[in-house]
Amino acid sequence: MIEHQLIFPTQVFRAQYQPADELQRTVVPILLEQEKNDQKPLKYTANGYTDYGRENLLERPVFKDLKEFIDDVVVRCHKQTGLQNTPSLKSSWFSINRKYTYHEEHNHLPDTWSGVYYIQADRDHPGLTLVNPNMKSNWPGTYGRAELNDVNSSSVTCAAFTGSLIVFPVSYTHLRAHETSLH
């Protein structure tokens, strides 16, 4: 028998916000109106829209309950991971993704946690792709893979659903693949 041990396993957390449909109906028109009225000459993504850095989005009154939900989930994830102190939300923003939009590989160092909440995600949404840090060293080299699994895959994609919150360590490099749907 060969024993194995997971070294430095990483937990990625998912929680579902129950009043997601109600929040979606309320805030999607507000966010689309903000995009329409934005006079900035430089857009963050072609064919999409990202409002980043102007404010902490979750401080708006319309997001009060969602912010409380996210704060609670992140604190529970933090404790479950065995970390000390209490994390606090530093920034939040929104992106509107349309056909052909994407977001390249990046992370949000030096914080502790990153998270993505999906206000609206249809079944064709590409989800959140987390990049395996072990692959940066070209492991497993030239041997190939008999099957892809959590150990040898270069990335894992977390499905996106309306109302889902995905929380992961900030050091994890992540991306959003090209959007293929028309929405």
How would you describe each model-predicted region?
Residues 173-180:
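Conserved small/polar residues in nucleotide/adenosyl-binding loops
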Residues 97-167:
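Catalytic core of non-heme Fe(II) oxygenases with the double-stranded beta-helix
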Residues 7, 86, 107-111, 181:
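A generic structural micro-feature
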Residues 83-92:
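A short coil-to-beta-strand element that immediately follows conserved catalytic motifs
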Residues 55-57, 80, 95, 122-125:
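Contiguous segments within soluble domain cores/interaction surfaces
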Residues 1-81, 102:
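Non-heme Fe(II)/2-oxoglutarate
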